[in-house]
Amino acid sequence: SFQGKKLYAGLVDAYMRKLLVEGFTLEFFIEGGRSRTGKLLTPKFGLLSMLVDAALLLRNRKVRFVPISIGYERIIEQKAYVEELSGGDKQKENIGGLLRTPAILRSRYGRLYVQFGEIIDLEQEKAGVLGSALEDAGAAALSPKQRRALVQRIGHRVVYEISQATIATPASIVAMALLDHSRRGLSHQSLHETCKILLAALQRFGARIAAVALDEQGELRDDALREAIALFLDGKLITKHETEEDPIYEPVSDRRLALEYYKNTIIHFFVPSAMVFSALALQPSRSATRAALRAQVER
């Protein structure tokens, strides 16, 4: 945090201006830290505000923001996250300590996914704030209110593009299927069918699906499902009950928060439909025109 540290803030500001002038790429984390729930955090504007201020003073140099989504099939810190969400103290992050734990080195963590969202152009966003494209307009063309609006516009746009670029993995789909049903456990066949339904919905919503999850026809691969199940079994997030017909998978009761993390990485894709269904449920006749639903959703 830069609060109360004017010298530190000034040095960082000057350093970023120097890097921009010389054409270097800058990396920063718009959320300000790691999400403990799997849901995207609201944008933090401190560094972004400094970067925008510096960029507005440049001439003859295009500045663009590249949203990047980094997703994990299984996270190393899941135990610490669950403890924090359950009311425990936040532990200082120390990757060295994690890697020295024997269980960490023996466990499987699956794949890591890096995806890029739509590139955001500073000049275009500035034109959106001003209402028209102004050539060679620097910081002087923006009032303090407009500058704040520009920073917030870019920050929220970056987070949105990251959310749209997030990969739906077999693990996230399996977690959602296991948590969002009325029974305690699901047979392998029922789990497969539920995951197929969720996959079809995600495809309709335009979500990016992990290539490993799909066969040549775009259908859910059973071995991808089994691999996700194996990751959760290895992490002791679910239990497997053998039966004569089909194994049954059940979330471990005190590890549900960990499963929620993986479910939450894709839950935002379902929000628009959920809002429409909620608006429809509020209609007395359970039917409404498109205009009435839009008005209800936008309230």
Residue ranges with predicted function:
Residues 1-299:
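Membrane-interfacial terminal anchoring regions of lipid-handling membrane enzymes
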